[in-house]
Regions:
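ABC family nucleotide-binding domain
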Residues: 3-4, 9-214
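Conserved small/polar residues in nucleotide/adenosyl-binding loops
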Residues: 218-220
Length: 220
């Protein structure tokens, strides 16, 4: 059984005004195995973000099914979705999605706080991750006090701290300069070597080249 299975996904949006329909996804099929590093390639407007939103259970498909460890996401009640995402999925976004009023440490802690973890437990989980990502010295700083590369490392730490089954990365190098992008991609390589499954959405050929395999326009 694959870790993630996608069967016949279709997504159609209908405009509120005029009832015009736009098809964002059509018959998308693929699977991701435990420990794989997979890139979904495509230009802007090709449906990559729509697909990622469905995989993250932030949106529902018009047709088709997504299964994580054999469980269909369509079976999960709306009231359970937030907890399901926290427990199973890690997210890395292009624009970091860090809260400026929270320190780097507290930003990383946020999914654990929402899960009701104690402060001591959170610190125990953070220590090895911060060491691996090289962010021990910036934990007490705020997002506006650190570089873009450091912000993205903090975002990666937040994604990893819940020990997710899969990390979903949406254009993770999009807001970074060339050097910071290279550093982040090397970091993803290292994280993947520990067994972490990564699914990355990108339009960058260079970023996609770090993955085991690519899923391109023929599928998305």
């Amino acid at each position: 059984m694959s870790l993630l299975e996608v069967h016949g996904l279709k997504k159609v949006y209908t405009s509120r005004f005029g009832g015009q329909s736009v098809q964002a996804l059509s018959n998308v099929n693929f699977s991701v195995e435990q420990g794989e590093y997979v890139a979904i390639m495509g230009e802007s407007g090709s449906g990559k973000t729509t697909l990622l939103n469905i995989l993250a259970a932030l949106d529902r498909p018009t047709e088709g099914e997504v299964l994580l460890e054999g469980r269909s996401m369509s079976e999960i009640r709306e009231s359970e979705l937030a907890a399901y995402r926290r427990e199973n999925l890690g997210f890395v976004f292009q624009d970091f999605n860090l809260l400026d009023t929270f320190s780097i440490r507290d930003n990383i802690f946020l999914p654990l706080v929402l899960s009701g973890k104690r402060y001591e437990q959170m610190n125990e989980k953070l220590a090895p991750i911060a060491r691996k990502l090289g962010i021990e010295d910036i934990l007490s700083k705020y997002p506006y006090e650190v570089s873009g590369g450091q912000k993205q490392r903090a975002a990666v730490a937040r994604a990893l701290i819940t020990q997710p089954k899969i990390v979903l990365a949406d254009e993770p190098t999009g807001a970074l300069d060339s050097r910071a992008s290279d550093d982040l991609l090397s970091l993803f390589d290292e994280i993947n070597r520990t067994g972490q499954t990564i699914l990355m959405v990108t339009h960058s050929v260079k970023a996609a080249s770090h993955a085991f395999r690519e899923i391109g326009r023929a599928h998305v």
